[in-house]
From Swiss-Prot:
One of its GO terms (molecular function) is ribosomal large subunit binding. Its main location: cytoplasm. This is Ribosome-recycling factor. It comes from Arthrobacter sp. (strain FB24). GO terms for biological process: translational termination.
Amino acid sequence: MIEETLLEAGDKMDKAVEVAKEDFASIRTGRATPGLYNRVLVDYYGSPTPLQQLASFAVPDARTILITPFDKTALRDIERALSDSEVGANPSNDGNVIRITIPELTKERRKEYVKIVKAKGEDAKVSIRNIRRKAKETLDKLVKDGEAGEDEGARGEKELDALTKAHVDGIDDLLKRKEAELLEV
């Protein structure tokens, strides 16, 4: 039962790290990356559809993204969704593809994005700690109910702490890399 609790906590922590990676990828760094547009929803035939399901992305150079829709009739809808998105894109439509040129980030904007990244990183760490707290409560309950011995409970708690530390360190590593990427001119 202790192993199951630890496995479940590990899976949840892995998901929290994945969410943090996606959050970090959606923050603009002044460099063209398709991950910027992962959260853009296009009104496609009346239903909100993720952009990556409607088009392919290409990055011909560091400041340009080419978006080629699978269905040319969706070109205008995609362009509208990109213009309305919080990414701040200025798409240009040539009838076949949408070209987005990523402008250079100002120093103030970079610092603002670093604050956002730190906040998202802290949110991820808090969610990992909450997962740890719930798993520890489960372990304590198992020991209290006599389903596991105190030694097993203590061992499980040590493993849980190591698991938590590894995941928090992973978030810190992602955070440092994203900060360096943002501050790189």
